[in-house]
Structure formats: C-alpha cells, structure tokens
Amino acid sequence: MKTLNRRDFPGAQYPERIIQFGEGNFLRAFVDWQIDLLNEHTDLNSGVVVVRPIETSFPPSLSTQDGLYTTIIRGLNEKGEAVSDARLIRSVNREISVYSEYDEFLKLAHNPEMRFVFSNTTEAGISYHAGDKFDDAPAISYPAKLTRLLFERFSHFNGALDKGWIIIPCELIDYNGDALRELVLRYAQEWALPEAFIQWLDQANSFCSTLVDRIVTGYPRDEVAKLEEELGYHDGFLDTAEHFYLFVIQGPKSLATELRLDKYPLNVLIVDDIKPYKERKVAILNGAHTALVPVAFQAGLDTVGEAMNDAEICAFVEKAIYEEIIPVLDLPRDELESFASAVTGRFRNPYKHQLLSIALNGMTKFRTRILPQLLAGQKANGTLPARLTFALAALIAFYRGERNGETYPVQDDAHWLERYQQLWSQHRDHVIGTQELVAIVLAEKDHWEQDLTQVPGLVEQVANDLDAILEKGMREAVRPLC
C-alpha cells in the first residue's frame, strides 16, 4: 500500500499565502480543512506553510507526505443522521521546523504573497517569556517568534503598508488576538525596535480575536487499518473530527471577501465582538466536557459517547448545564438552551472521543471553563452549585492516576503532576487527611488567581465529595446528583 505523497497522488498545489504556527490535529481538521474547501470552490488559491513552533521530532513532519493528509469528518449532521466524509487535504504545502530551519522560517517573510497567519500553540502559547531576545534563533515564546518574523517582513519590504498580515490566532484564551498583539508590541519595545515598525504593526496588520469550535478526535488509532483499506493508501496523519464546526472571527468586514466567504458558505462568522459567543461556548461546551471527563472516566467509561448513553452520567451532565451553568450566563435563556441542546447532541456522536484525550491540562481547564460559573452560582444563590463542586472533587480524585487497580496516564504541567503525586502519597500514608489535601490544592493562588479556601464552604464540600468518591466509588458517590 502506497503512502501519501504528491508524486503518486497528483493534484492541485496552491501558492503559499498562509503561515500556520502549529502542526497539531486541531488546526489540520479545522483551519486547513476550511482552506481546502475554499481552494476547491472559490479562487482563494492559497497554500499553507506549517511552522512547528516547538523543538520536537514527534510526530514526524507533514513534509514526509508532501503536506498531504486525510480528514475524516463524521458524526451526526443537522438532521441527526450519522455521516462520514473522507477528504484528501491539499491545502498544506510543507512543514518547517523553526528550530532546525530558522533561515527558512525567516524567508517566509520575504514572500510578497504571504497574507495570513493562523496559530494554535495551546492555551499556554500566547504568553510572555522573559529573556527572549531578537537575536535568538529562535526565541522560545510564540509571540517573540512572531515579532521577529513581522520585523523581517517590515525590513524586507521597507515598511510597505500593503505587505502587512491578517493574524488569526485560534488559541483558547479570551480575546486571543488582543493578547497576541500586546505581547508583540511588548517584545518590539523591549528589543528597542524602531518606532516606524511599531507604527507599521498598527497600520498594516490586523490581529483578530477568534472563537473556534469543533471537536477534533485526532488520529483514529483503533481504526487505522480498516480506514486505510477503505482509502487505498497509508496515511500517518489521518485526522478525525465531528461534523459540527463554528469559526467566529472578530475582524474587519473586508475579511469575508479576502477569505472568499462570500463565494462559498462555511460556518464562519465575521463579527464586531466575540465575547457572547465565547462565553456561551467555553461555559457550556468546554465546561460540560471538563465536568464530564473525571466523573465518567472514574465511573468506568472511556468515551464521551459511552458517557452520554449512560443514563446516570448523562443526567449529571445535563443537570450541570441546565441548572448550574446556564442560569449564571448573560445571554438570552432560549438561545443558551438551544446551544446546549446542540452540544448534548454533539456529545452523543457515535464516533469515539476518548475521555483521556480531553483530560489533558485538566487543572487549567477547570479554572477557565468551570470555576467562573461555580463562583457566580455561589454569589447569586449563597450556596455552592452541587455538580460543579462535585466535578472539582472528581478532578482531584482523577489525579491519583489509578482506576480499579490499573494506572492510566495523567497529562498536565509538571507542577501539578509532582504536587498530586506528593499529596496522594501523603494521603495514602495518612500523613494528611482529605480536607487538608483539598485545602492545599485550593490554596494555590498562582494557579487559581485567588485563594479558593476563602470561598464559604468550598473546602468542606469538595472534601465531603472526595471522601464519598474514595469510600463508595464514583458511581455511588455521583448518584444523588443524577
């Protein structure tokens, strides 16, 4: 069986007009998939150069397949029918590593046709890294790398106003475009780059904030042999995603024409303010995911679909959404309920979305996706929302890394992995009790951005829930909340 490459699988190749920081599954099944559709159905005619922003050789480079790969988009469509659509993506031309091909990276700025920059460098990617310098080859942080590339562009074209870029970050942080722009300006000032460059940044470039929404299930490990047999070729970069997607971009109205959205209908909205869309999605879709994962996994389930077909776990999630999340959100209730109904429908997607793959960086996800609603509920009602509080206890229990005597991988930053290993070891040895363990976790101001032990009743309630999970098991402990 042949492996994908452009010699054996000839077809359209597009001039390079898009730089993409990030080679991961999400961008490939979201941005590159949409660009591919626009290339086919309009005269967008734009190829993507993927820049690998971190120093790693895993996964291998997309260039090993000449940028080609297959997306398999599947799930329930708008009519509730199960669909599956395989598409050979030709929008990506090549991948370069900013670490091993730094000169090639800078040369991207010399191409007059370059117009767009997309990125997904994870929720931690748009951040300041002290000590990044102009001469670093490369700097460590993504914003510093981008600043250097923009300066290369500015210098090469002598500050021409028609050579600026439209920069569209897809990282899951609030107002990601504004945050990225502020960091680029910070590096420009820190590196004492000329005032003319700072003016050019402002006048010639657009930093657009976005909301991205698609569940991307990635490489379908369990089904690869069957899928490759159906496709007739080997593809080391197979990428699976759900049918539903939404891309909301806060940017100039002219963007719709530039991206040819007026010529082919995609679920892309160009808006003046993404805030309401963001709050709805992060609180309901991401919040429900984050509440569901530690509860369902420790109840013995492995995928989102299994969890939604389990009467008790499904009831827990739906009650969390309708009784504890929606009431504290600032949008019309009917609009929120209709979005929530679409979300739970998407969760019933018959294709496997592994709970463990969503569990990545669970501590940060809880802080950004659930904590605001938990605190708002407590403030509004004077009582803690029972299910969101239970989800926090379940999350702490999840970091034991053991289910029914078997270990499972827990992925989070090193600080939390070490912290939990130490705390659970002390708990097992009866050095600390459950309430003390919970208090230590909730007192981590650097993480929570506040001292959660000061929230009335929170330590006690989380400790009670955690004791119930440890003594009775997840099924018994969660039952009263279903």
UniProtKB/Swiss-Prot annotation:
Catalysed reactions, as listed in the record: D-altronate + NAD(+) = keto-D-tagaturonate + NADH + H(+)
Domain of life: Bacteria
GO cellular component: a single term: cytosol
Pathway where it operates: Carbohydrate metabolism; pentose and glucuronate interconversion
InterPro entries linked to this entry: 6-PGluconate_DH-like_C_sf, 6PGD_dom2, Altronate_OxRdtase, Mannitol_DH_C, Mannitol_DH_N, NAD(P)-bd_dom_sf
Keyword annotations: NAD, Oxidoreductase
Catalytic class of the enzyme: oxidoreductase
GO MF, one example: mannitol-1-phosphate 5-dehydrogenase activity
Binding site for NAD(+): 18-29
Keyword ATP-binding attributed: no
Gene Ontology BP, a term: mannitol catabolic process
Similarity comment text for this entry: Belongs to the mannitol dehydrogenase family. UxaB subfamily.
Name recorded for this polypeptide: Altronate oxidoreductase
Organism from which the protein derives: Shigella sonnei (strain Ss046)
